[in-house]
Amino acid sequence: MEAFVSTFDMKTDAKGRVSIPKAFREVLKAESFSGLYCIPSPDGQAIDAGGGRLFSMLQSKLDGLDPTSMEYDLLSTAFFGESEIVNVEKEGRVTLPTRFQEQADIEGDMIFVGKGYKFQIWSPGRYATYRQQALAQARTVLWGSEQPAGAMS
């Protein structure tokens, strides 16, 4: 199974379109998903994006719930009512919905970050802050609260 990996700085064109990184397009193609499934990230800092695996993962969260329950109603609104399937041009470009860009504080260039079954689209400033948190958390998980002697940060 292919995964979304790596980080890419992407430029927008004069029409506000951005190219999905080629490596990510290949994963989307392998998933046989038409378009790009986009949803605000749970913390509201970025845009979650992907194909069939992201869509299926969210659907599986609902599958065990009573479809008449309030929990199902709330989650289905968050997962599907707040999402959009964005058209991917044959050249691999997309125009992200304005509401998603505003929510993620994206104004122009974007950072695409692989997350395995999905990827995220960030504003460069927000991602720089988040990246530092992620790396600090990874160091804590790998080495505990203390970094081993001689380790590079």
Predicted feature locations:
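Acidic/histidine-enriched, glycine/proline-rich intrinsically disordered or flexible terminal extensions
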Residues: 134-153
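Beta-rich strand-turn-strand
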Residues: 84-107
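C-terminal end-helix/capping segment
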Residues: 113-140
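Helix-adjacent hinge/juxtasegments
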Residues: 48-85
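Short loop/turn motifs at secondary-structure junctions and domain boundaries
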Residues: 1-3, 29, 76-78
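Extended intrinsically disordered, low-complexity coil regions enriched in Ser, Thr, Gly, Ala
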Residues: 29-34, 41, 103-117
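Short, structured motif recognition centered on aromatic/hydrophobic residues
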Residues: 16-20, 49, 92-96, 100, ...
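A positional/architectural concept
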Residues: 5-18, 22-42, 46
